[in-house]
Amino acid sequence: MNAKLSHGVCLFLLFFVPLSGLPNPAQTSATETQAVQVAMKNVTYHYTEPIVVHIVRLEGELLPTNPRALVVFDDKSSFTLALTSAEIAISCNALAQVLNENVFSFAGAPLKDLSIESKNDRLIVKGKLRQKMDVPFETTGTLSANADGRIRLHAEHVKAAHLPMKGLLDLLGIDLARLINTNKVRGVTVEKDDLILDPEQILPPPHIQGKVTAVRVQGNDIVQVFGTPQASNFAAKQPGNYLAFRHGDIRFGKLTMHDADLIMIDMDRRDPFDFYLDHYQDQLVAGYTKSTPEYGLRVYTRDYNQLRSRPTTSQPGKR
């Protein structure tokens, strides 16, 4: 092994402890694991290949779902993203995909084949009523932030089979509205002529915690504002696009970083940082790493959409 490579390996090992040398956290710690502070700027985040959101800015914490366990990048169910402040945009197409795949995908779901488009500051939602012989429907409405932090879609115009209806309840009927308002349909409820969406429940893992304080239609995107904008964050001096993590413990692959000081930096600042947690390892391998005098890591990361060979399936162990 040449001297340069040997020196690099030694530096790398200073930051990490191999998993084989770690006791089982559930057996060794009787105290709660410290939350990991997180900040993001201008990130295109993939929940799945088609379900993508644009994180304009974000400050919050990664909370282990098991208080005595670690945040594990290879297990999206191991943590929740608690938002202190964020601005996140999701396209109409991506939201329709979320509703079709995550909310109304179960056998007997009342709605199917949903599509969403924007017109001026309105949303147009189309679909079929499964329990009414797949009758097509269309509703046009406005968005607002509910007092409890959910999103309210107020239906102004409703049609079924191209015929105007009095309102959403007239379209659905009492029985269908009651079916939507059960625990079978996660994150969606009906209140009179309004459809209420809960971002905490409708999105795939990793799940978020946070209250929507404002929402608007901007072009083909639905822009959600969570919390109150912060004056600064711990990574504010970092230029460009990034995902930053500080404090707490993080495990990824065979390595664990204690008292984390990790920033993943976009190698191409010309567009948003395209990041897919299911394939973070492929993105890391395509980049390079630098260490800081304070034992932190700065990982210059390739955009997912710029990988030469895009993975076709998730890596083993992804959940």
What are these regions (language model features)?
Residues 1-9:
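Bacterial N-terminal signal peptides that target proteins for export
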Residues 5-6, 20-23:
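Short, intrinsically disordered, low-complexity terminal segments
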Residues 10-18:
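Bacterial N-terminal signal peptides
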Residues 24-319:
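Extracellular/lumenal and peripheral-membrane lipid-interaction modules
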